[in-house]
Amino acid sequence: MSILALVEDRPTPKEVYNWKIYLLAAVASFTSCMIGYDSAFIGTTLALSSFREEFGFSTMSKTAVNLVSANIVSCYQAGAFFGAFFAYPIGHFWGRKWGLLFAGTIFTLGAGLMLGANGDRGLGLLYGGRVLAGLGVGAGSNITPIYISEMAPPSIRGRLVGVYELGWQIGGLVGFWINYGVSETLAPSHKQWIIPFAVQLIPSGLLLIGAVFLKESPRWLFSRGRREDAIKNLCWIRQLPADHIYMIEEIGAVDQALEEQRTTIGLGFWKPFKAAGTNKKVMYRLFLGSMLFFWQNGSGINAINYYSPTVFKSIGLHGANTSMFSTGIFGVVKTVVTFVWLLYLIDRLGRRLLLLIGAAGAAVCLLIVGAYIKIADPASNPTQEMTGGGIAAMFFFYLYTVFYTPSWNGTPWVMNSEMFEPNMRSLAQACAAASNWLWNFLISRFTPQMFAKMEYGVWFFFASLMLLSIVFVFFLVPETKGIPLESMDVLFESKPIWRAHATVLAKLREDEEQFRHDIEESGYSKTGEQQVEHVSEDLPKV
């Protein structure tokens, strides 16, 4: 088998790979467009002279400016931290669809509040709006990956959850370029900096409109006892009748997983909290999920996202427009590489190998950039044009982006969406998303101070964390590509970790062959023509 071949846990009818599943993933991923845009535009907006003049940055000390900038950026992450947890009861009781509508509504209210800010009113409305927007994206970062993973066929689950990451990068691309556009085309004014804030309403509006038409997650419906609705939605998504053998297998696996949960963790609202504190298997996976986001943020990527002018200045780029243009190129590179990751790598090369390769390559590039800054000290020796060493440093910076983006950028979100059983999934994803926003908050809050105090040492610091992540992934993180959600317990119990995927996949294929043999022995047609009453229960074929 080719290393880039799709991995199927069982023969999958071509009808399963239909446009509906991609459409649902795309609509849900407007949440990540909100996140990506908000993460990208704020740093360069704070660098606009019109914004700095209106809010009196010119009268503040450098320390005060760094503090205010860090507060504006980081209150968004603080809101997102709590939003990730608030989404748990909504997703549990009301479902994934209503959770997405909640996220879009709160974000829209926050974006609208920010539009009321000006020099006379001060920064209060910006702070309040950023916190509300953070609550919205925190909720969305919890619910969206779960929603997509619960609908996705195992063989393309990484690709579909990857659409969430693609939305993040597209939003980021717009956010990186919009300030360059307004700075080049508009004179410094209130209008110049308020336009980037207003654009936030576009992805949230699209989410609110699209989410109305989304199908509820079949697995959530099963967990709530709404079996008829669950089978109907699953048939619509898979484009197969309820009595097709593929559907019988999938529904049977969900039933079995729910029964196992009922006898172990339990299906109530509070049961997952008890499991999170007492069940060693659950605690271990929560630890893995949180640490994946620790290493992701330890790559330094969010320091670049939020403070790109500061980052590029440390390499030797001078001038606001030059930094904004370089930031825009950074966004283009991330988006292009994300397409490659989405279409060819995540479900073919897998999660584990991508993380290992990405960490090694990113670490080398960060070390080279840090060494250049240490030797050349471009901040203390500015030149009109970049030197050859500076150009090489920029090359390795963009090469770092190429290594990081198809590995650590989206893969932790994919893995956290698929590691847990159904009733644990909402709380576990809440913990994982909150963990991401916690590390994100710390990076965004202290990056200006780190660059002021550590200078080139910041690059070595992030490189060291990337090297340590290699050890973590190799010994503790199993490969999950192609493994059904209902078989994750077996995967994480298999040892050694680096062979677990092959072991479990072989067992799944053996069980599937036996299941089909038993079905055929009982007189069931391979084409699914015979009615299977305990599954379809008088549902019409779709």
From Swiss-Prot:
Gene3D superfamilies: MFS general substrate transporter like domains (1.20.1250.20). GO terms for cellular component: plasma membrane. It is found in: Cell membrane. Residues 1-22, 96-97, 152-159, 215-285, 347-352, 409-456 are cytoplasmic. Residues 44-74, 119-130, 181-193, 307-325, 374-387, 478-542 are extracellular. The keyword Transport applies. One of its GO terms (biological process) is quinate metabolic process. Keywords: Cell membrane, Membrane, Quinate metabolism, Transmembrane, Transmembrane helix, Transport, Ubl conjugation. Residues 523-542 are annotated as: Disordered. GO terms for molecular function: carbohydrate:proton symporter activity. Its main location: membrane. It comes from the Eukaryota. Residues 531-542 have a biased composition (Basic and acidic residues). Ubiquitinated. Deubiquitinated by creB, probably to control its activity or amount. The chain crosses the membrane at residues 23-43, 75-95, 98-118, 131-151, 160-180, 194-214, 286-306, 326-346, 353-373, 388-408, 457-477. It holds the Pfam family Sugar_tr. It is a multi-pass membrane protein. Interacts with creB. Belongs to the major facilitator superfamily. Sugar transporter (TC 2.A.1.1) family. Integral membrane transporter that imports quinic acid to be catabolized as a carbon source. This is Probable quinate permease. It comes from Aspergillus fumigatus (strain CBS 144.89 / FGSC A1163 / CEA10) (Neosartorya fumigata).
